[in-house]
A protein has these predicted regions:
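Receiver (REC) domain active-site loop signature in two-component systems and cognate sites
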Residues: 57
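Charged docking surfaces used in two-component/phosphorelay signaling
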Residues: 17-25
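Active-site beta3 strand of CheY-like receiver
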Residues: 46-52
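C-terminal output helix
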Residues: 108-117
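Short hydrophobic/Thr-rich beta-strand motif most characteristic of the beta2 strand and flanking loop
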Residues: 27-34, 42
Length: 130
């Protein structure tokens, strides 16, 4: 089985590096985007298995990126996990309203991150076999 490819979208390089190391240690491949525009391009060209999307980014928020990814026939099938430091039902509702598949609140442990990604991968695999 090929390594799952995860697109990490975050404007903080240190966060991208930490997440990338966690994913690598779990046998996953990571691809990085540091802004929303790059995320849209990379999602289309790389076809990741899951997108880990920070909500609070300059120029284009994660909400906008998620909405555009879900509107694009080439990327709408990719599960998106929104990452936010907002611990509110409003943040969760807004993520869902733009098409996110899951929400992960900061701070999170590497184990929580990997478990959430594995859940999304399992759901995708289940949908492909039915």
């Amino acid at each position: 089985m090929a390594k799952p490819k995860i697109l990490i979208v975050d404007d903080e390089p240190d966060v991208v590096t930490l997440i990338g190391h966690a994913l690598d240690s779990e046998g996953m491949e990571s691809v990085a985007a540091y802004d929303g525009i790059s995320a849209l391009d990379i999602a289309e060209s790389e076809s990741p298995d899951v997108i880990l999307l920070d909500i609070m980014m300059p120029m284009m928020s994660g909400y906008e990126v998620c909405q555009q990814l879900k509107a694009n026939p080439e990327t709408r099938h990719i599960p998106i996990i929104c990452v936010t430091s907002a611990h509110s039902t409003e943040a969760f509702a807004r993520c869902r309203s733009v098409g996110a598949n899951a929400l992960l609140t900061k701070p999170f442990s590497p184990a929580e991150l990997v478990a959430q990604i594995q859940r999304q991968l399992a759901k995708t695999e289940e949908q492909e076999t039915t």
